Curated annotation (Swiss-Prot):
SUPFAM superfamilies membership: YbaB-like (SSF82607)
HAMAP family (UniProt xref): DNA_YbaB_EbfC
GO molecular function: DNA binding
Official protein name in the record: Nucleoid-associated protein CTN_1899
GO CC terms: bacterial nucleoid; cytosol
Keywords, comma-separated and alphabetical: Cytoplasm, DNA-binding
Subunit description: Homodimer.
Cross-referenced PANTHER family: NUCLEOID-ASSOCIATED PROTEIN YBAB (PTHR33449:SF1)
Assigned protein family: Belongs to the YbaB/EbfC family.
Lineage: superkingdom: Bacteria
Principal localisation: cytoplasm
InterPro entries xref list: YbaB-like_sf, YbaB/EbfC
Subcellular location: Cytoplasm, Nucleoid
Organism: Thermotoga neapolitana (strain ATCC 49049 / DSM 4359 / NBRC 107923 / NS-E)
Length: 118
């Protein structure tokens, strides 16, 4: 088998190269499996955002699905305030979802020695 130079300039014999490739493929498969499991778990992970002192509250899952919206009865009379608070709550929930997803992704990438992937 032909020797191939690695990135460090050293020659890798055929056996070493094959083992490295097999190890890499196995790690890639494990990483893909973990990532798929994580994606599936996002439908169960909930985050909550509350704005206006609790006047508007949103609960959503980390797969970006809104489960619940609560609006204080007093906001019925003030449509402009309601729209502002609703926009703020949606923005906050999206930020929280992304942060949670990044935290979960970081847990997996650290297991595989891939810091800063997300």
């Amino acid at each position: 088998m032909k020797k191939i130079k690695s990135f460090g300039g050293k020659s890798l014999g055929g056996g070493k190269q094959e083992k490295l490739l097999k190890d890499f493929m196995k790690m890639q498969e494990e990483l893909q499996k973990k990532m798929q499991e994580m994606e599936e778990s996002f439908s169960e992970m909930e985050v909550e955002a509350s704005v206006g002192g609790g006047a508007v509250r949103i609960v959503a899952t980390c797969d970006r699905r809104v489960k619940e919206i609560e609006i204080d009865e007093d906001l019925k009379e003030d449509l402009e305030t309601l729209k502002d608070l609703l926009a703020a709550a949606v923005n906050e929930i999206m930020e929280k979802i992304e942060k949670r997803r990044e935290e979960e992704m970081s847990k997996i990438t650290q297991q595989f020695g891939i810091p800063g992937l997300m």
